[in-house]
Regions:
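Conserved, structured core segments of small domains
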Residues: 1-113
Length: 113
Protein backbone atom coordinates (compact mmCIF):
# COMPACT_ATOMS: atom_id res chain seq x y z
CA UNK A 1 0.00 0.00 0.00
CA UNK A 2 1.02 3.60 -0.58
CA UNK A 3 1.66 6.01 2.28
CA UNK A 4 -0.09 9.38 2.47
CA UNK A 5 0.29 12.33 4.82
CA UNK A 6 -2.97 13.78 6.07
CA UNK A 7 -2.38 17.38 7.15
CA UNK A 8 -4.98 18.70 9.57
CA UNK A 9 -5.83 22.41 9.38
CA UNK A 10 -8.03 23.79 12.15
CA UNK A 11 -9.14 27.23 13.34
CA UNK A 12 -9.91 26.00 16.86
CA UNK A 13 -6.85 25.60 19.13
CA UNK A 14 -6.28 22.05 20.39
CA UNK A 15 -6.92 23.02 24.02
CA UNK A 16 -10.34 24.41 23.00
CA UNK A 17 -11.55 21.40 20.99
CA UNK A 18 -14.80 19.94 22.32
CA UNK A 19 -14.41 16.67 24.28
CA UNK A 20 -16.38 14.75 21.65
CA UNK A 21 -13.92 15.86 18.95
CA UNK A 22 -10.96 14.77 21.08
CA UNK A 23 -12.67 11.42 21.67
CA UNK A 24 -13.22 11.05 17.92
CA UNK A 25 -9.50 11.69 17.33
CA UNK A 26 -8.65 8.95 19.83
CA UNK A 27 -10.89 6.49 17.95
CA UNK A 28 -9.51 7.47 14.53
CA UNK A 29 -6.92 4.64 14.21
CA UNK A 30 -9.68 2.07 14.81
CA UNK A 31 -11.99 3.74 12.28
CA UNK A 32 -9.16 3.87 9.74
CA UNK A 33 -8.53 0.14 10.21
CA UNK A 34 -12.24 -0.55 9.66
CA UNK A 35 -11.81 1.06 6.21
CA UNK A 36 -8.99 -1.35 5.33
CA UNK A 37 -6.23 1.22 5.79
CA UNK A 38 -3.64 1.70 8.52
CA UNK A 39 -2.46 4.69 10.54
CA UNK A 40 1.34 4.57 10.64
CA UNK A 41 1.85 7.64 12.84
CA UNK A 42 -0.11 10.58 14.17
CA UNK A 43 1.12 13.79 15.73
CA UNK A 44 -0.60 16.88 17.11
CA UNK A 45 1.32 20.15 16.90
CA UNK A 46 1.76 22.86 19.52
CA UNK A 47 -0.01 26.16 18.72
CA UNK A 48 1.14 28.38 15.85
CA UNK A 49 2.75 30.83 18.27
CA UNK A 50 5.40 28.22 19.08
CA UNK A 51 6.56 27.85 15.45
CA UNK A 52 9.89 29.18 14.20
CA UNK A 53 10.44 29.63 10.46
CA UNK A 54 13.73 29.65 8.57
CA UNK A 55 14.21 31.13 5.09
CA UNK A 56 17.83 31.14 4.05
CA UNK A 57 19.70 32.83 6.91
CA UNK A 58 16.60 34.55 8.30
CA UNK A 59 15.03 32.98 11.40
CA UNK A 60 11.66 34.39 12.52
CA UNK A 61 9.09 33.57 15.17
CA UNK A 62 5.85 32.12 13.88
CA UNK A 63 4.78 30.14 10.83
CA UNK A 64 5.63 31.01 7.21
CA UNK A 65 2.14 32.35 6.53
CA UNK A 66 -0.47 33.97 8.75
CA UNK A 67 -3.80 32.25 8.09
CA UNK A 68 -7.02 31.65 9.99
CA UNK A 69 -6.60 27.89 9.65
CA UNK A 70 -3.35 26.61 11.11
CA UNK A 71 -1.56 23.32 10.69
CA UNK A 72 -2.73 21.52 13.82
CA UNK A 73 -1.46 18.00 13.21
CA UNK A 74 -0.45 15.36 10.74
CA UNK A 75 -0.89 11.65 10.46
CA UNK A 76 0.47 9.11 8.02
CA UNK A 77 -1.74 6.39 6.61
CA UNK A 78 -1.27 3.44 4.30
CA UNK A 79 -4.03 3.17 1.71
CA UNK A 80 -4.61 1.29 -1.56
CA UNK A 81 -4.67 4.44 -3.69
CA UNK A 82 -5.52 8.15 -3.58
CA UNK A 83 -9.28 7.55 -3.63
CA UNK A 84 -8.95 5.20 -0.66
CA UNK A 85 -6.74 7.75 1.16
CA UNK A 86 -9.30 10.50 0.53
CA UNK A 87 -12.11 8.34 1.90
CA UNK A 88 -10.05 7.64 5.02
CA UNK A 89 -9.06 11.31 5.43
CA UNK A 90 -12.74 12.29 5.42
CA UNK A 91 -13.02 10.47 8.76
CA UNK A 92 -10.84 13.14 10.42
CA UNK A 93 -12.84 15.06 13.03
CA UNK A 94 -12.65 18.80 12.27
CA UNK A 95 -14.47 21.65 14.04
CA UNK A 96 -13.70 24.49 11.61
CA UNK A 97 -11.06 23.64 9.03
CA UNK A 98 -10.12 20.81 6.71
CA UNK A 99 -7.52 18.26 5.73
CA UNK A 100 -5.01 18.00 2.91
CA UNK A 101 -3.85 14.62 1.59
CA UNK A 102 -0.43 14.17 -0.01
CA UNK A 103 1.27 11.00 -1.21
CA UNK A 104 4.65 10.40 0.42
CA UNK A 105 7.77 9.80 -1.63
CA UNK A 106 8.59 6.66 0.29
CA UNK A 107 11.98 7.40 1.81
CA UNK A 108 12.78 4.88 4.52
CA UNK A 109 12.45 6.04 8.10
CA UNK A 110 14.53 4.42 10.82
CA UNK A 111 12.56 2.33 13.28
CA UNK A 112 12.77 3.35 16.94
CA UNK A 113 14.71 0.89 19.07
Amino acid sequence: MTQYAVLIYERVPADELPPEVMAAHEKLPERIAEQGAREVAGLALHPNETATSIRGDLVTDGPFIETKEVLAGVFVIEARDLDHALAVAKLTPIVDGGVEVRPLLGFAVAEAT
